[in-house]
Amino acid sequence: MFWFKNVMIYRLTSPLSLESSSLEEQLQQAKFTPCSQSDMSKFGWSSPLSGSELLHFSQGKQFLLVSHKEDKLLPANVIKKETEERIAVLEEKEARKLKKTEKQAIKDDVVAMLLPRAFSKHQFTAIWLDLDAQLVYVDAGSSKRAEDTLALLRKTLGSLPVVPISFALLPSEVMTNWIAKGHTPNWLNLLEEAELKSFDTDSVIRCKRQDLESEEIAQHLQAGKFVTKLAIDWENHFSCVLNEDATLSRVKFADEVREKNDDILKEDIAQRFDADFLLMTEELKLFTQKMIEEFGGIKERI
């Protein structure tokens, strides 16, 4: 199961409805295929469930997809060295300087020669569509990685009107008040890690193994710094770092959560996957609702 390690939440700005069989047909049109000897990169959909031919997993109005990107690794310095050597040999042989187009052609030949021997890097990105709430969750640690997968889904479906979720209150201000005014929600425990930032001077302080209720931290907040990253623990659920843009990083589900379905035999992969997906999505739905409450509700963009 793809237990999310990072969470970026997007809101659908127009209602989206999906039907399993038609979605599968669309996904199959963009199915991942490995790089051939002449490909630098390939991007498409892979099956979320090991051993299944289906390119999506669904429970009611909940859909899980997994994008698969393969990139051939060709070190730029290797290409540069080989290209320069070939150019030097040819220029000496012909007693003239090569044109820009000729140099590019040589570089292209070098890349074509090296590609079949290049190693591949594979990247899998899970995306969960909660169509009950009209929200999209992406397991990505960067906006670019999330946007790449959303762009693939947009191309697959023909349309995908989404924006990053935003709230009436700024998360950085709310997190700052949790520490400065002792307004931490009773369901949440602060861990000893945070990032404080001054928006006036761009100065940044990163704290680890630091009591966030100490006088030292209080002085930084009084001086006008805001909390932009905060390590938190939702007891018996999961821990994570909550960021100023309401994204979550380093999500780690509690053992109590991950062990709930241990009564299902490991051999029954499909049943365990189904149960774990339900478990994870319910946890993230609950946390999203708590964020909505703490941050004053979802902000509707014009």
From Swiss-Prot:
One GO BP annotation of this record: regulation of DNA recombination
Cytoplasm as UniProt keyword: yes
InterPro entries: RdgC
Compartments, record wording: Cytoplasm, Nucleoid
Alphabetical UniProt keywords: Cytoplasm, DNA recombination
Domain of life: Bacteria
GO molecular function terms listed in the Swiss-Prot or TrEMBL record: double-stranded DNA binding
Cytoplasm in keyword set: yes
Role summary: May be involved in recombination.
HAMAP family: RdgC
Similarity remark: Belongs to the RdgC family.
Family matches, as NCBIfam families: PRK00321.1-3 (NF001462), PRK00321.1-5 (NF001464)
Name recorded for this polypeptide: Recombination-associated protein RdgC
Native species: Actinobacillus pleuropneumoniae serotype 3 (strain JL03)
